[in-house]
């Protein structure tokens, strides 16, 4: 992305309060939903097949809310990538589970943070990486113009990105052996030959085995991280939950 254009967007997003970022995000989500039939059909199929909702009214509400939350995720992502660290941290209103992190750090075996695509997942790494070293495994996007934006946006504080290839896995292992933390998005489809088929809500899902292998090899503590959205414009609550070794021993757990 052209530096002048990038600087313009940084300036623009610095002027937009979180309330309007999320409000515009809801609108973007609905526009995207209208024009992207593949994503729309996938969302409807997934929520229908989950069988969580007992009637069509509840299902329709869930679909509409999901559309809005997806839009928020997109706009929040850009806002986080383009904003200063201090501004992003001001959006964090509460943090739960810091005792688990402290205990994990005292074990000196490293931490594997699992951050699924729920809520504002971008803010969890910015929060931890503002205090301690964090190596984040990430899959470069197909859109080339996004690569530098994501690298600059996520590598704030003590954060470092590692690609999803052999060199990236080596970076992850090196960080864990130094008793540092790493971040992994566990709900991405694994590369061919690097996953295991498991049943998820009655559907087959090809799930990564990297986390269970890393935990077994290094003895690292595994902690789930989640950025919960509070009321619109009110910021986020970050949750850290330590997982048992049995839970992460296999994707089937």
What is the role of each PLM region?
Residues 81-253:
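Soluble catalytic domains of membrane acyltransferases
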